[in-house]
């Protein structure tokens, strides 16, 4: 072989080696870029999944909060309706023996608390006559005055130092938690 052929063959081998190395380098670069793109898209996908999960949780949380708010509104309305029903029932019972016994019991308890028979008794204008009769029967002295209450009585000593509020409004306010519990039981134990 001639020198010229040896040089050509040598250059051909170098070119073939370069071609092989070039293919390996190109393949390596393509893999590296593909891995980088895959990592980037995987991270973006993970972020999107995370955002979707957070959005789902936010939607569920908002729905739960809204449901609880509506339930609370319904309970409040039920409680108002129950209190109004009590007031209406008292209005129907005025003058009945059971209501007179109720007023008698309130006045007896108030007398024990204030420890005097000389008292000022405040009553609803609708109850004034009944309260005057019950007070006389119990031996209470003093006056019976009208007050803007729905029922029951407010008893105070003449000097005003002790007051016992047994108005229907006060009695209901003191029992409001029991009424809420009763409503809850009635709703969930059916």
Curated annotation (Swiss-Prot):
UniProt superkingdom: Archaea
Annotated membrane topology: Peripheral membrane protein
Subcellular location: Cell membrane
InterPro entries per record: ATPase_E_C, ATPase_V1_Esu
Entries under SUPFAM superfamilies matching the protein: V-type ATPase subunit E-like
Example GO molecular function: proton-transporting ATPase activity, rotational mechanism
Coiled-coil features, chain-numbered ranges: none
Keywords assigned by UniProt, alphabetized: ATP synthesis, Cell membrane, Hydrogen ion transport, Ion transport, Membrane, Transport
GO biological process, one term: proton motive force-driven plasma membrane ATP synthesis
Gene3D superfamilies, sorted: ATP synthase, E subunit, C-terminal (3.30.2320.30)
Cellular-component GO terms for this entry: plasma membrane; proton-transporting two-sector ATPase complex, catalytic domain
Complex formation: Has multiple subunits with at least A(3), B(3), C, D, E, F, H, I and proteolipid K(x).
Physiological role: Component of the A-type ATP synthase that produces ATP from ADP in the presence of a proton gradient across the membrane.
Family: Belongs to the V-ATPase E subunit family.
Record protein name field: A-type ATP synthase subunit E
């Amino acid at each position: 072989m001639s020198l010229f052929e040896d040089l050509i063959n040598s250059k051909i081998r170098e070119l073939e080696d370069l071609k092989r190395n070039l293919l390996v380098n190109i393949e390596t670069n393509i893999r590296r870029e593909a891995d980088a793109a895959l990592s980037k898209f995987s991270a973006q996908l993970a972020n999107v999944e995370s955002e979707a999960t957070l959005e789902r949780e936010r939607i569920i949380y908002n729905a739960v909060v809204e449901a609880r708010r509506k339930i609370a509104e319904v309970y409040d309305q039920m409680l108002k309706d129950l209190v109004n029903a009590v007031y209406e029932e008292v209005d129907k019972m005025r003058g009945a023996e059971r209501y007179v016994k109720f007023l008698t019991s309130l006045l007896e308890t108030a007398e024990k608390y204030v420890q005097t028979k000389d008292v000022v008794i405040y009553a609803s204008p609708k109850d004034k006559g009944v309260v005057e009769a019950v007070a006389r029967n119990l031996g209470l002295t003093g006056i019976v005055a009208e007050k803007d209450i729905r029922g029951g009585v407010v008893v105070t000593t003449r000097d005003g130092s002790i007051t016992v509020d047994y108005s229907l409004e006060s009695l209901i306010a003191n029992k409001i938690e029991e009424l809420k519990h009763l409503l809850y039981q009635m709703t969930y134990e059916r």
